[in-house]
Amino acid sequence: MDLVDPSQSAAAAAGTQTVKDEVSEKCQKLFQDFLEEFRGSDGELKYQSDAEELIRPERNTLLVSFIDLEQFNQQLATTIQEEFYRVYPYLCRAVKAFARDHGNVPQNKEFYVAFQDLPTRHKIRELTTPRIGSLLRISGQVVRTHPVHPELVSGTFLCLDCQTLVRDVEQQFKYTQPSICRNPVCANRRRFMLDTNKSRFVDFQKVRIQETQAELPRGSIPRSVEVILRAEAVESCQAGDRCDFTGSLIVVPDISQLATPGVRAETSARVGGTEGYQAEGVQGLRALGVRDLSYKLVFLACYVCPTNPRFGGKDLHEEDMTAESIKNQMSVKEWEKVFEMSQDKNLYHNLCTSLFPTVHGNDEVKRGILLMLFGGVPKTTMEGTSLRGDINVCIVGDPSTAKSQFLKHVEEFSPRAVYTSGKASSAAGLTAAVVKDEESHEFVIEAGALMLADNGVCCIDEFDKMDTKDQVAIHEAMEQQTISITKAGVKATLNARTSILAAANPVGGRYDRAKSLKQNINLSAPIMSRFDLFFILVDECNEVTDYAIARRIVDLHSRIEESIDRVYTLDEVRRYLLFARQFKPKISKESEDFIVEQYKRLRQRDGTGVTKSAWRITVRQLESMIRLSEGMARMHCSDEVQPKHVKEAFRLLNKSIIRVETPDVNLDQEDEHEAEEEPQEVINGDASVPSGVNGHVNGMNGHAEEPNAATPKPSLRLNFAEYKRISNLLVLQLRKMEDEDETSQRKSELINWYLKEIESEIDSEEELVTRKQIIDKVVHRLVHYDQILIELTQTGLKGTGDEEVPKEEDPYLVVNPNYILED
């Protein structure tokens, strides 16, 4: 071999003896026999075709299955596993000899071997010194990647004294010169020059991986380790990927520690004191090796593969995917299952139940999240403007309505998902941070949650608890799907093509149906408009629903396996999802007209003010409808968006808007509360009758003073839009009177003014009585429930209580100074 001979001849010339590693050489011979002789299940020589591939200039690594090696020779497999770092160079020589036998490869080309299918997987925190040098498989999430650069692995040095070439000086992960010139008559130990043309370099990349949450012991913080990738393994993983790394644990000098300024620790045998022998020995042991013994553990990986591969084989980049390439990656059985799923008439429902088997109800939310996973089609206009295809979903709801469960399910299911909490996330943690590299001392970009979830889903819990300045940081990522950074001398625009699934709690803990959506959640208008779907989950008391949910929870606790009913397994859903996402459905003319028609309906209804409790309908909602329609078409593996897909998209969008519409206002609600709190007054027949209109109410409902007659009395309800209209009229009138006359109006005066305003609408005396009753109760609600109006009573001494009673029945009314009139 040209690798060994020069050093051996030089060693022989120098009069030194080279020690042969018999175990490694035997492994080399047996491993070459394995490559030559091993046959696959089809009877063909398995690795011969792979060796022929190595002729290509970009290929230099032969991938070997460890299971095949165990079948061929168990003892060889055990030796390689235990002594991997020792025998690795000899295995590479065996691959080189094998490649030369089966192909016309260049003489000076280096080859490497990589192992896959190792039976056991180790955790990062199990990487301790006893495992150094053995073949291991570890898994973790990539959190930082460094750029690829050339690494000197074997140097050729020129002696500056005698011009002798010293070849194949192995570099121990730092610049290493020969210890002495190999010319026997030259004693040079320092003056060497590297000959870069005759030295060997290899691609080198450093990545940092971190423990995943599933592997984390209780009460521990995630450990991280640096992984060194070489040759073909470089650029095989990106920040955010969860990967398996096969290789060995090694010890390398800590360059950053060696580079720190400090005095080199030296040992000396000094003689001092009254008696010389007392002070003999090494002095300064405390400082010994402070610089020299700075080493750290790193993982040298020869093979990288995704932890949860989309199929049994290689992972595919989303840009390179076609139906044919995906089909080729699947087995016949897997492809038949995908085809069977695409023909399923009830696919929509079955996918929802398979994804969220432990969550009862909330079918609309499940459908929205399912369409988010399929996504729309990203587009680029002629001007170069990008239109996002990812769908953003926000779930707003009361506590204990399974919001976080949805987020956790998506994080576990999606191959590329990041889960984070809003309160514990900063702007840099969500987007990207600029940090200083320990070794090069240059500024590098460290990926945040949105970058880690590129081409995936970012789940943000407690979205409403985020600080405003941190919410602003994700404006750009949610619409333009990029992150722009200009700090610390680094200017970059990064991709964040991610769907955002957010969960938020309403203000005050409970969703108030009497208020609009934007009043219920602590989010700015720009953020709200960037969400395609809003789902409101209200914890309502319903005997049937409560029983079903309780039964489901108890079933899950008692019979976990039996109660989870999945139509498809998660792997089947993942496979189908990836296959369906490569479709790029186009909108047909019929669907286009239908989308425009539905958008007009939404806009007109928004203009009438009926849905003031929903957010504003803008062009973004039109784009949302298009994305949802494309997601529906993708789910059914259709190349064209059909009207039925638009119909379902409109229904979902409409549902998320209508869902927040307020029910009719119960004007008798306060009377019912009073009846519960003051049972004595109900018996007397006074509590259920509002003050000021006793005569009319008694005239309308018969004998209201009888307790039995009051019980079946139907509650008086008013449409919410009508209620808001009346309240706005009253507020405007009171403010007008305050501005003009600087005086307040009494309650009776305000009621009379309102009745006079609607005089043309009243046809009979009965209707007048009803309208008076309604306006009286509206004023009562505005004062005591909504606190929009304030009653001003005449102040006086406690002893004059009898004189104040008639004035309190007709108090002055003013508008609460903190109240802002809605448009």
UniProtKB/Swiss-Prot annotation:
Q: Which residues form the signal peptide?
A: none
Give the MCM domain ranges.
347-554
**Coiled-coil boundaries:** none
Q: Which PROSITE patterns match?
A: MCM_1, MCM_2
User: May I have one GO cellular component term?
Assistant: nucleus
Q: What is its main location?
A: nucleus
UniProt biased composition (Acidic residues): 667-680
EC number(s)?
Answer: 3.6.4.12
Which purpose does this protein serve, as stated in its record? Acts as a component of the mcm2-7 complex (mcm complex) which is the putative replicative helicase essential for 'once per cell cycle' DNA replication initiation and elongation in eukaryotic cells. The active ATPase sites in the mcm2-7 ring are formed through the interaction surfaces of two neighboring subunits such that a critical structure of a conserved arginine finger motif is provided in trans relative to the ATP-binding site of the Walker A box of the adjacent subunit. The six ATPase active sites, however, are likely to contribute differentially to the complex helicase activity.
Q: What is this protein called?
A: Zygotic DNA replication licensing factor mcm6
